[in-house]
């Protein structure tokens, strides 16, 4: 059976088990999760509050909404769907990195060249060692992750070969965002992650800015506005650093945390700057 048919079959089974339904043939029944707002909700939208810190009481209504959104997102991801999510830098599109059909769907809906890589989102620093060959001290990883950085390292055999097949490297993200960390941990596997926008268009800081993508998504998780929306750095995305060469680092994309990241790499760990090697 092809990966695409397996993913569709997984989606149908999981949808049935949690009471979700498909839309008409050839369409996706997108559902919107968003915090309460005085503004009118979109018709049919489901409203859930996602506390930014995740520090809510176990039995509170806020925790119930948080958990419901997590369970819905995990169900869709395990079924091979694409889900829009908030991160610490921008809104992103996530799918199961193990599902080749879902990876192709991400490229297709963004209009993105398949020669451009997708990052991998994990829930814990300890998970990095499973999916990468790490050549830096553990303290360095913990100083930068979770955070607004993407660390590029040599990939391990654990990752799907259809994920970025053109490079032996992979970019690792652990966003400093409680929902994303909870989601990655509950999913129990690597998530492919990219920005929620059409290629060549501006990145998104709220869900309305990528509303044209909603019909192609299975689920939209609305965590509210990301950042102030005004500063020049707010749409730069994560700082991308190549750590694949021992003792050196390369800045692939300056991003929003360049100064603090390079200070840690050079002043604390003595790494030397080099040319970036990640495409």
Swiss-Prot record:
SUPFAM superfamilies: YrdC/RibB
This protein's UniProt keywords: Cell membrane, Cytoplasm, Disease variant, Epilepsy, Intellectual disability, Membrane, Mitochondrion, Phosphoprotein, Transferase, Transit peptide
GO biological process, one term: regulation of translational fidelity
Main subcellular location of this protein, as a coarse class: cytoplasm
Tissue spec. comment: Ubiquitously expressed.
InterPro entries the UniProt entry points to: DHBP_synth_RibB-like_a/b_dom, Sua5-like_dom, TC-AMP_synthase_SUA5
Membrane topology: Peripheral membrane protein
Mutagenesis / variant outcome for changing residue 84 to V: In GAMOS10; slightly decreased formation of tRNA threonylcarbamoyladenosine modification
Any single Pfam family the record assigns to this protein: Sua5_yciO_yrdC
Region called Disordered, residue ranges: 21-41
Molecular-function GO terms, alphabetical: double-stranded RNA binding; L-threonylcarbamoyladenylate synthase; nucleotidyltransferase activity; tRNA binding
Transit peptide: 1-55
Family: Belongs to the SUA5 family.
Subunit text: Interacts with RSC1A1.
Name of the protein this chain belongs to: Threonylcarbamoyl-AMP synthase
Source species of the chain: Homo sapiens (Human)
Gene that this polypeptide is encoded by: YRDC
């Amino acid at each position: 059976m092809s990966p695409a048919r397996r993913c569709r079959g997984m989606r149908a089974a999981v949808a049935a088990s949690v009471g979700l339904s498909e839309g008409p043939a050839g369409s996706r029944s997108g559902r919107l999760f968003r915090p309460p707002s005085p503004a009118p909700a979109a018709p049919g939208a489901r409203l859930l509050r996602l506390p930014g810190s995740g520090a809510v009481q176990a039995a509170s209504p806020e925790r119930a909404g948080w958990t419901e959104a997590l369970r819905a997102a995990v169900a869709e991801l395990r079924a091979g769907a694409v889900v829009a999510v908030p991160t610490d830098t921008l809104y992103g599109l996530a799918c199961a990195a193990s599902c080749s059909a879902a990876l192709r769907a991400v490229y297709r809906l963004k209009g993105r060249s398949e020669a451009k890589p997708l990052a991998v989102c994990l829930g814990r620093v300890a998970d990095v060692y499973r999916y990468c060959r790490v050549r830096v001290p553990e303290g360095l990883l913990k100083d930068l992750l979770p955070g607004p950085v993407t660390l590029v390292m040599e990939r391990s055999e654990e990752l799907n070969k259809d994920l970025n097949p053109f490079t032996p490297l992979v970019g690792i993200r652990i966003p400093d965002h409680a929902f994303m960390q909870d989601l990655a941990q509950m999913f129990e596997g690597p998530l492919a992650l990219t920005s929620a926008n059409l290629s060549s268009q501006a990145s998104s800081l709220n869900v309305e800015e990528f509303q044209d993508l909603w019909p192609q998504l299975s689920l939209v998780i609305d965590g509210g506005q990301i950042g102030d929306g005004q500063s020049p750095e707010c749409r730069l995305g994560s700082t991308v650093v190549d750590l694949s060469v021992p003792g050196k680092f390369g800045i692939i994309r300056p991003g929003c945390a360049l100064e603090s990241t390079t200070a840690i790499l050079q002043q604390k760990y003595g790494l030397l700057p080099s040319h970036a090697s990640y495409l």
